[in-house]
């Protein structure tokens, strides 16, 4: 699935960036949520699956020591050209470029939506590996009453019920801090969860 997602986004990276690669295209509630989360992040942070890099730039402008990563080289090249003051690199969510417990936070903003549901726990475990005790993850995704595939404009994506995603986060080593949902007219339901890494020492 990773290769299929990479290929689909490589073909449409320019189109995607033009349509969704700016903060003006983002919901005000999302900007406020991410800005509030950023105020509490104190240390190295990764924007995991950064796409065009606009959220990475947003975090950088809010004082976060952030690096954007994406497996699509076209996104990374474009982001680096648009935001030269912000670090970006090609990397995968399966193997984040961070040592154990090295990060204060990870933003995963709709970057898991194309992941087959059976593979999501492994990615959350990888996030947990990288986040230090009391560090946080902000996860955005499409919400529904059951796990269900749908025809995303780029490539197949998946809805997740909030309670099931909370359970997966808990199993990976996180405690739920906040949960947010919203339904915009004519749009798919959205959800976001802020989760704190449980102590590495038990």
Where in this protein do the model-derived segments appear?
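Class I SAM-dependent methyltransferase SAM/SAH-binding core
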Residues: 46, 52-95
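A short acidic, Gly/Pro-enriched loop at the edge of an enzyme's catalytic core
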Residues: 94-106
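Conserved beta-strand signature within the Rossmann-like core of class I S-adenosyl-L-methionine
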Residues: 134-141
């Amino acid at each position: 699935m990773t290769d299929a997602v990479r290929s689909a986004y490589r073909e449409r990276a320019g189109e995607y960036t033009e349509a969704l690669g700016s903060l003006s295209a983002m919901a005000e509630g999302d900007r406020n949520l991410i800005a509030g989360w950023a105020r509490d992040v104190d240390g190295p942070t990764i924007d995991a699956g950064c796409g065009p890099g606009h959220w990475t730039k947003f975090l950088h402008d809010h004082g976060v020591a952030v690096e954007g990563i994406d497996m699509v080289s076209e996104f990374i090249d474009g982001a680096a050209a648009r935001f030269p003051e912000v670090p970006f690199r090609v990397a995968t969510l399966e193997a984040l470029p961070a040592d154990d417990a090295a990060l204060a936070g990870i933003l995963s903003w709709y970057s898991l939506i194309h992941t087959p549901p059976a593979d999501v726990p492994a990615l959350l475990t990888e996030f947990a590996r990288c986040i230090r005790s009391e560090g946080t993850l902000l996860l955005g995704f499409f919400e529904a009453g059951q796990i269900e595939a749908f025809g995303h404009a780029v490539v197949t994506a998946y809805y997740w019920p909030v309670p099931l995603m909370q359970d997966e986060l808990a199993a990976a080593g996180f405690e739920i801090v906040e949960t947010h949902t919203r339904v915009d007219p004519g749009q798919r339901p959205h959800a976001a969860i802020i989760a704190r890494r449980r102590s590495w020492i038990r």
